[in-house]
Amino acid sequence: MAETILRLKGIRKELELSRDVRQTILPNLSLEIFEGEFVAITGPSGSGKSTLLYIMGGLDKPTFGKVWLDGQEITGLDEAEMTVIRNRKIGFIYQFHFLLPEFSAVDNVMMPMLIRRKYGKKEIRERAMKLLDMVGLEDKYTNKPNQLSGGQQQRVAIARALANEPKVLLGDEPTGNLDSRSANNVYELFARLNCELNQTVIVVTHDEDFANRAGRRIHLVDGKIESDSRTPRQATA
């Protein structure tokens, strides 16, 4: 049986709008994600999807409740400790790629590994090139972001997110700025990573096609899990 990679218990998130007014985003949410799952989180705007994702990734803290990542409770960690966890165990992909414009594709992918300092610079460069090969950009090593299409930029961002072999890959609307063809290519890449590498993938999306093709779909309404369903993994093209 697959191990639990992410566990959330009694998560409540409130925003302080003023001295006397608080808004509840997530009222009381508990959830387990298992190693090797491909999960889509859906729901209307304002349902708490991105807030939930950021709490999973340690980018935001719950008002109450606890989060465990890979068996370690992360809710009590300070920012310096959480930065180390994010660098080593979590890969993030956003709607906008956030690539450094002055650096090439391979340099952007190298950045997380240079920060971690687990490998020498030569090996880091070789690993970055292999990651770009894996996402189909073997001929774009030296291209800067402005020399790449939107879909190619997002694939560089995915390669960068994979640089330190994360336990969990988190995506916040990663296909939101892409045309349908590029969005499908990104989905196929996520599905391949999930199938071939057993990579745990959790994606917030408004894309119904993307969500329906994931192995598990969690639908939020008003910060509560309205449905949580698993489907047979669909074959990729």
From Swiss-Prot:
Protein's recorded name: Lipoprotein-releasing system ATP-binding protein LolD 1
Q: Where is the signal peptide?
A: none
PROSITE patterns, per database record: ABC_TRANSPORTER_1 (PS00211), ABC_TRANSPORTER_2 (PS50893), LOLD (PS51244)
Subunit comment = The complex is composed of two ATP-binding proteins (LolD) and two transmembrane proteins (LolC and LolE).
Its subcellular locations are: Cell inner membrane
| Coiled coil regions, renumbered to chain | none
Q: Which family does it belong to?
A: Belongs to the ABC transporter superfamily. Lipoprotein translocase (TC 3.A.1.125) family.
**ABC transporter domain residues:** 6-237
Q: Name one Pfam family in it.
A: ABC_tran
Which keywords describe this protein according to UniProt?
ATP-binding, Cell inner membrane, Cell membrane, Membrane, Nucleotide-binding, Translocase, Transport
Gene Ontology CC, one term: plasma membrane
Which GO molecular function annotation, any one, does this entry have? ATP binding
Enzyme's top EC category: translocase
Q: Tell me the membrane topology, using the record's own terms.
A: Peripheral membrane protein
The record's function comment reads: Part of the ABC transporter complex LolCDE involved in the translocation of mature outer membrane-directed lipoproteins, from the inner membrane to the periplasmic chaperone, LolA. Responsible for the formation of the LolA-lipoprotein complex in an ATP-dependent manner.
- Give the EC number(s) listed in the UniProt record: 7.6.2.-
Positions binding ATP in this chain are: 43-50
Q: Please give the chief subcellular localization of this protein.
A: membrane
Tell me the Gene3D superfamilies matching this sequence: P-loop containing nucleotide triphosphate hydrolases
Q: Mind telling me which InterPro entries this protein's record contains?
A: AAA+_ATPase (IPR003593), ABC_transporter-like_ATP-bd (IPR003439), ABC_transporter-like_CS (IPR017871), MacB-like_ATP-bd (IPR017911), P-loop_NTPase (IPR027417)
